[in-house]
Amino acid sequence: MAYDKQALIDQLGQLTIMELADLIDGLKETWGVTAAVAAGPAAAGPAAAAEEKTEFDVVLVDAGASKINVIKEIRAITGLGLKEAKDMSEKGGVLKEGISKDDAEKIKAQLEGAGAKVELK
């Protein structure tokens, strides 16, 4: 049985909504199907969230009230001179870049023990 697809589309386009609903119900009964929407693929979470970060930067946010102790810790951690460590304690910024999580947490604990506010990024 040959059919003209365009003629069929034109005929369906002339049907009212009620006639289309009856047609759909008739097709469901004849073929034994339901008009369920196919589910798309499940959206995966962001790749960055799935992977654990391996390199961290230790950032000094604030030296706190006991700047002398913080300066001593900065010198011990970075190997900077007294003036550079003092400047770092006043300005803040990145103390260490690209280090492991364990090392970053140790440094953070040292600096917080001295009274500084530190972030890991």
UniProtKB/Swiss-Prot annotation:
Q: Which keywords are on file for this protein?
A: Ribonucleoprotein, Ribosomal protein
**Cellular component per GO?**
cytosolic large ribosomal subunit
Question: Which SUPFAM superfamilies does this chain map to?
Answer: ClpS-like (SSF54736), Ribosomal protein L7/12, oligomerisation (N-terminal) domain (SSF48300)
Q: Which domain of life is it from?
A: Bacteria
Name any one Pfam family assigned in the record.
Answer: Ribosomal_L12_N
Keyword Zinc-finger included in the entry's annotation: no
Q: Name one GO molecular function term.
A: mRNA binding
Relate the protein's function as given in its record.
Forms part of the ribosomal stalk which helps the ribosome interact with GTP-bound translation factors. Is thus essential for accurate translation.
Quote the PANTHER family the UniProt record gives.
39S RIBOSOMAL PROTEIN L12, LARGE RIBOSOMAL SUBUNIT PROTEIN BL12M
Entry's family note: Belongs to the bacterial ribosomal protein bL12 family.
Its protein name is Large ribosomal subunit protein bL12
Q: Which organism is it from?
A: Deinococcus deserti (strain DSM 17065 / CIP 109153 / LMG 22923 / VCD115)
